Amino acid sequence: MSEKTIALLGQPNSGKSTLFNGLTGSRQHVGNWPGKTVERKDGSFVHKGTTYKIIDLPGTYSLSANSDEEVVTRNYIASGQADVVCILADASQLNRSLFMLADYAGIRVPVVLLLNMMDVAKSQGKQIDTDGIAKSLGVPVVPLVAADKKEYGEFFRMLESVDKTASVLKENQLAQVYHSSIGTAFDEIKSLLPADGIGIYSSTWLTAKLMEQDKSACSLVKENVDASTYAAVE
């Protein structure tokens, strides 16, 4: 029997834990992340001969390393242990929920966007163009009602083809946003970094984090460029 690992990411109250519980039932374990007081939840389920291990990562609003929850989430994503990262967004508050995606653009891991609470969005009279969102972001988009297991059909169909369909979020729009809001300083710093980025992090994402003075990103860059380049970055 083959095995795959899914990481669940999302803002607090995105329905992430509801989906986790719906998929795993009693097949779950709760503990702490090593060296942290942050709760770790993992579980598993079987679908069409494949065992899926699910990691319910802490609810966060970004991947900046400003809290233990954010550090845990970012380190796990960077570890490459997940075969696919499922990001949950609240379909009833789509603009607000999609804002967090900017922080995942530029991190080169396979991503699927799960639009949860589609029933609420529908009751509000909202029509969501999932195909249009998928085309814009460059990743699969799956409508979902995490509180209703009968609505998991499209999620399971996504799993069956995830090896072929999951892809990295497009970062070109992220770069444009930073360039328009920050100006030439963004481009100047980006030009000092390795063109291919560092590890799973693109140069665009690293530049954004450097400008936020993200301590972990600063340390990573310092370890991977020469002293004169890092001095110029500072």
PLM region spans:
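Extended helical scaffolds that flank P-loop GTPase cores
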Residues: G138-P140, T165-E234
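Conserved nucleotide-binding/hydrolysis micro-motifs of P-loop NTPases
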Residues: G35, G59-T60, A91-N95, M117-K122, ...
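Conserved G1/Walker A P-loop phosphate-binding module
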Residues: M1-L63, G80
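Canonical P-loop GTPase G-domain recognition
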Residues: A121-L174
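Residue-level signature of catalytic and energy-coupling elements of molecular machines
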Residues: L19-F20, V38, D56, T73, ...
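Conserved C-terminal guanine-recognition region of P-loop GTPase G domains, centered on the G4
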Residues: G43-K48, V72-P140
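Helical mechanochemical/support elements of P-loop NTPase systems and associated helical scaffolds
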Residues: P34, K53, A65, E69, ...
